[in-house]
Amino acid sequence: MRKLLTLALLAASSASLFAQCDALFISEYIEGWSNNKAIEIYNPTGSAIDMSDFRLERYSNGATAAQENQKVVLSGTIQPNDVLVYVLDKQDPDGVDFEAPVWDELAEKADIWLCPVYEENNAMYFNGNDAMVLRQISSNAVLDIFGVIGEDPGSAGWDEITQNHTLVRRPEVTS
C-alpha cells in the first residue's frame, strides 16, 4: 500500500511540474550516427500552437551567433500537451555517405522533415558539440537552449553524453 501511495504522489507531483510550464521546449534531442538527427518539441499549454512563428538555430562548434543557413523556420501545429518531431530530411534509400538515409526507427517518428540540402540550410546537422536554440521569431525570445552557446566541448560533446546519443528532458525540469 505504501508503494502505491508513493507512486500516486510521484505521478501527481510530475503532473503539477508540467503544469508549471507555459512555453514550448525541447523535450528530446536525438544525435545519432550519421544523418540520424531529430529534435522533439513539446507543447505544455492548453492551446494548439502554429509553429510558423518559431525556429531552430544551430550554434556550431562554440559559435556565439548562428549563421543564416543555421536557422530553420518550423512548420506544423503542435496540439496541446503533445509533441512534434523534426527530423533531418535524409530519406533516399539509395543515399550513401553524406546522403545516407535516416534509420527506419527514426523515420517512423518523424512528423516533419527539415534541411534536405546542407548547402542551403544546415540547422539540423548538429553533431554533439553544437548548441541548439528554440526561438520565437515575433518576440525574438529564446524559449529553450540545448547546450551552451559560445562553448565548444570538443568532438565528444558535453561530458561525452551528447554525441551519438538520445537525450530526453527529465519531467522535473521545467525551466
Predicted regions and their residues:
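Acidic glycine-/aspartate-rich tracts in secreted/extracellular proteins
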Residues: G32-W33, P44-A48, S60-T64, D89-P93, ...
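Conserved beta-structured recognition patch
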Residues: I112-S175
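Short, surface-exposed secondary-structure edge patches
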Residues: G46-A48, V73-T77, A123, D159
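A structural motif detector for short, solvent-exposed N-terminal "entry" segments of globular domains
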Residues: A19-N61, M124-N127, G150
